[in-house]
Swiss-Prot record:
InterPro entries in alphabetical order: IspD, IspD/TarI, IspD/TarI_cytidylyltransf_bact, Nucleotide-diphossugar_trans
Organism of this sequence: Alteromonas mediterranea (strain DSM 17117 / CIP 110805 / LMG 28347 / Deep ecotype)
Site note Positions MEP for the nucleophilic attack, residues: 155, 211
EC code: 2.7.7.60
Name the record gives this protein: 2-C-methyl-D-erythritol 4-phosphate cytidylyltransferase
Function (record text): Catalyzes the formation of 4-diphosphocytidyl-2-C-methyl-D-erythritol from CTP and 2-C-methyl-D-erythritol 4-phosphate (MEP).
Enzyme category, top tier: transferase
Length: 238
């Protein structure tokens, strides 16, 4: 029996206004390459990923300056929202493909974490899963339209959702289409799958897999990338 293909989908059509930069955050430089280049390379270099699709905004003026079309990737038009971009990315996938959706602004993703997530393929208990980290801080709920604390949330069982997020492509396509048609707030792929009634697994991931959102995230991501490349270099020597 042939193993299902794993296709990575990177929604990269966002503007990233919170970064307050002169360009979308995925095109900011980090350790000599753009954030998007680091992210694409991390997925291209993983031995269990068969294909990489990148969804970019129409009229993107930065993508073609990087020579990324020379890499073995496919490029599709992004949409207005993240869910639209992901949907455009998976429309061409085959019935048995699995979609591995990963944020463009998470360049520090760990190879071992990806492998652990991909081990869910073939599981009879869940439909797919996501990388996540358990909440460590005390969580407060505030009253609506105020900064007054309503109560303290029990953090037991609370996790920070990360990416990649892995699901059978056709099930994810239907879940996204149904969610969008019904006006559901789709903040990530797992939320669409949850709405569709599927069981989604949590796979513990590295806290280094940060999403670059604010300027202060850049030096932290740079530190994590240097650690990652140093570890890869040491591994290659041994």
């Amino acid at each position: 029996m042939t193993s299902p293909r794993v296709v990575a989908v990177i929604p990269a059509a966002g503007v990233g206004s919170r970064m307050q930069a002169d360009r979308p955050k995925q095109y900011l430089s980090l350790n000599g390459k753009t954030i998007l280049e680091h992210t694409i390379d991390a997925l291209l270099n993983h031995p269990l990923i068969d294909d990489v699709i990148v969804a970019i905004s129409q009229g993107d003026e930065y993508f073609d300056q990087l020579g990324l079309r020379q890499k073995p990737i496919r490029v599709v038009d992004g949409g207005k929202e993240r869910a639209d971009s992901v949907l455009n990315g998976i429309l061409s996938l085959d019935e048995n493909d699995w979609a591995l959706v990963h944020d463009a602004a998470r360049p520090c993703v760990d190879d071992a974490d990806i492998s652990n997530l991909l081990s869910l393929i073939g599981s009879e208990d869940v439909t797919g899963g996501i990388l996540a980290t358990p909440v460590r801080d005390t969580m407060k709920r505030v009253k609506p339209s105020s900064n007054i604390i309503s109560h303290t949330e029990d953090r037991n069982g609370l996790w920070h959702a990360l990416t990649p997020q892995l699901f059978p492509a056709m099930l994810l396509k239907r879940a996204l289409q149904e969610g969008l048609a019904q006006g559901v707030s789709i903040t990530d792929e797992a939320s669409a799958m949850e709405f569709a009634g599927h069981s989604v697994a949590m796979v513990s991931g590295s806290p280094a897999n940060i999403k670059i959102t604010h300027p202060a995230d850049l030096p932290l991501a740079e530190f994590y990338l240097k650690q990652k490349f140093s570890a890869q270099g040491d591994s290659a020597k041994n």
